[in-house]
Amino acid sequence: MTPVGTITNSANVYKVPSLRKVPEIGPVSVESVRQRMRGNTDAVDQAVNKKAMSFEQTLLRAFDQVNQKQQKTAELTEQMIVDPESVDVHDVTVAMAEASMSLKIAQTVIDKVLKSWNDVTTAR
């Protein structure tokens, strides 16, 4: 920075550095800002008004996932019996543990739903 000038008072002399030129901002159209704001609010509205899955859909989807884990375990086990070199034992063990855990969780959910239903129907 090169000094532009000096400021002097009775005790000191100050050198004033040059200021960097501030970039000019072109004209801003209010309409372009509004369009960007509308675009943002549209995205928010879509996220907020997104249809939620019903309890039935959520439950069926979870049971489908449990079924997929069971099928994957069966396939890996069968593949291990037919061609042991093509499958890692660790993968089979992990798949079995995931399938077992998901089945236990599904059973717990079913038990809780039935208990809640029985409580509601008998609470006349």
UniProtKB/Swiss-Prot annotation:
GO molecular function, one term: structural molecule activity
GO cellular component: bacterial-type flagellum basal body
Keywords: Bacterial flagellum
Keyword check for Secreted: no
Main location: other
Pfam families, per database record: FliE (PF02049)
Disulphides: none
Gene Ontology annotations of biological process type: bacterial-type flagellum-dependent cell motility
Record's keyword annotation contains Glycosyltransferase: no
Localisation per UniProt entry: Bacterial flagellum basal body
Membrane-spanning residues: none
Family (UniProt): Belongs to the FliE family.
Protein name: Flagellar hook-basal body complex protein FliE
Organism of this sequence: Treponema pallidum (strain Nichols)
Classification of source organism: Bacteria, Pseudomonadati, Spirochaetota, Spirochaetia, Spirochaetales
Gene name in the database record: fliE
